[in-house]
Structure formats: structure tokens, C-alpha cells
Design a protein with these regions (language model features):
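N-terminal leader/targeting segments and the immediate start of mature chains
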Residues: 27-70, 220-229
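N-terminal secretory signal peptides that target proteins for export/translocation
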Residues: 1-12
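An acidic-aromatic
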Residues: 76-128, 198
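Gly/Pro-enriched, hydrophobic low-complexity segments
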Residues: 35, 115, 139-229
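Bacterial N-terminal signal peptides
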Residues: 14-28
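Short, solvent-exposed helix-to-loop capping segments enriched in aromatics
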Residues: 125-139
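Short hydrophobic/aromatic-rich beta-strand segments that constitute the beta-sheet cores
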Residues: 54, 85-88, 104-107, 160, ...
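N-terminal mature ectodomain segment of secretory-pathway/periplasmic proteins
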Residues: 45-101
Length: 229
């Protein structure tokens, strides 16, 4: 049975608490010559809600001379600006992460355990600001140093480094590709100070869908242990 960190999410999900978030949603069409920063700006400006499926590969550094270990999970994601999102992990373990605008909830079905944090304190300068919170590119640049990187894997890339270096997050790389509907935010790569690397790829993307309010509501299941931080 997996254990929950005393002060946070399960180890495999620590990057998601730092980010929680993360998504890849199609953007309105942008010129073919547009760079990664242009695509990011269009995403923030024009995408108010979205949903997608995702696969997450978390690579942890090896210990005592052992090679690195990689664990893969998949699930679904939805978000609505400002400040609401939901991750539902299906395999190999069921977990739910919900930000309702006030509280960040993590439910581990295997442990029947809920962790609740004040959302403003839990997110801060994290990937969630890019996906669900920041109103414009200038707001992001107050918290991140944003630089374009060379194309890789058929995608345009941006590197985002938090200006506040007091957390676990080291940097975020965001990859865009050109799809049938224009630029798509396709990949999110996150590195932390423990040497852990998380790569999320997205599929079955829907842009600006009408999402029910219940998507971003969470009620702890009966009998669940609740930890509040």
C-alpha cells in the first residue's frame, strides 16, 4: 500500500501538487511562424475551459547505484478559468485532485484518505498558474522567467523557471504542436529539486466546452480520513 507524505501528496504526485496542473488543449489558429510564446499567449487569452485525457510518466532518480525508475499513470483532466481544475487518475491507482477555487483536494481511493489545502497557498508559482489561473502573459512573467527553446519532437517549446526559488519546482517545459485546429499545447515536462521528472502528454482534446459546476466540486467520501493543511 502506498503511503501519503506527512506534509503533501504521495511521492508520485508531488509534481501535480506543485502544478496540478497541467493540460494540453487545442488553441485557436495562430500563424505558422508563431513561436512558443505566441502560442502560450493565445492559449491564455482564448481558452477559458477545456478537457483532455492524459498519460503521465514520472521518472525518479536511482538510489545506491540503481538505474532510474519510471512509473506511468493515465487519466482525464478538465479546467475552467479562473482557478478551477480536476484530475482523475484511473490507472494503476485511482486518485482525484480537485481545485474548486478555494481549496485544493486530493483523494486517494486506495487509502480512503483526503488531503485539503488552501488553494492560494498550495499553488502559488506553479504550472497551475499557466493552465488555469494567469489572466495574461504579463501576469505569468511576474512569477516565471519564460524563454523559447529549440524545436524538439515536432513541437515548439517554452521553458518556464519560477522566480521564487523557495519551492520544489525547478522548471516547466511546455511543448506546442500544430494540429488541424491550429496550435495545440501537447506536452508538459516538470522537474523538481529532488531530481524527479514528470512528463505529461495529452489526447482527445476539447476546447472551451461547457462544463457542469459539479466537475469542480468535491465532497469527502463517508469514512475517509481527512488531513487539513
Amino acid at each position: 500500500m502506498r503511503r501519503l507524505h506527512a506534509r503533501g501528496l504521495p511521492r508520485g504526485f508531488s509534481l501535480l501538487s506543485s502544478f496540478c496542473l497541467a493540460a494540453a488543449l487545442a488553441l485557436p489558429a495562430v500563424p505558422a511562424w508563431a513561436g512558443g510564446l505566441d502560442s502560450l499567449e493565445q492559449f491564455i487569452k482564448n481558452t477559458r475551459s477545456g478537457k483532455a485525457d492524459f498519460t503521465q510518466a514520472v521518472t525518479m532518480p536511482g538510489k545506491d547505484g540503481q538505474p532510474p525508475r519510471t512509473k506511468t499513470q493515465d487519466g482525464s483532466f478538465a479546467f475552467e478559468r479562473p482557478g478551477k481544475f480536476r484530475f482523475d487518475y484511473r490507472k494503476p491507482f485511482a486518485q482525484t485532485i480537485v481545485a474548486d477555487g478555494q481549496t485544493l483536494w486530493l483523494y486517494d481511493a486506495d487509502l480512503n484518505q483526503v488531503t485539503a489545502r488552501q488553494q492560494a497557498q498550495a499553488l502559488g508559482s506553479t504550472p497551475a498558474a499557466i493552465i488555469a489561473a494567469a489572466p495574461d502573459l504579463k501576469a505569468l512573467e511576474r512569477d516565471f522567467t519564460l524563454t523559447e527553446e529549440p524545436d524538439r519532437d515536432g513541437q515548439q517549446w517554452i521553458n518556464a523557471e519560477p522566480k521564487a526559488r523557495d519551492g520544489q519546482l525547478q522548471n516547466i517545459r511546455i511543448g506546442f504542436r500544430t494540429g488541424a485546429r491550429g496550435a495545440e499545447l501537447a506536452t508538459l515536462e516538470i522537474a523538481d529539486s529532488f531530481g524527479q521528472h514528470s512528463a505529461l502528454t495529452f489526447s482527445h482534446i476539447e476546447v472551451n466546452p461547457s462544463l457542469p459546476a459539479a466537475s469542480f466540486e468535491f465532497k469527502p467520501p463517508a469514512g475517509a480520513d481527512i488531513l487539513r493543511e
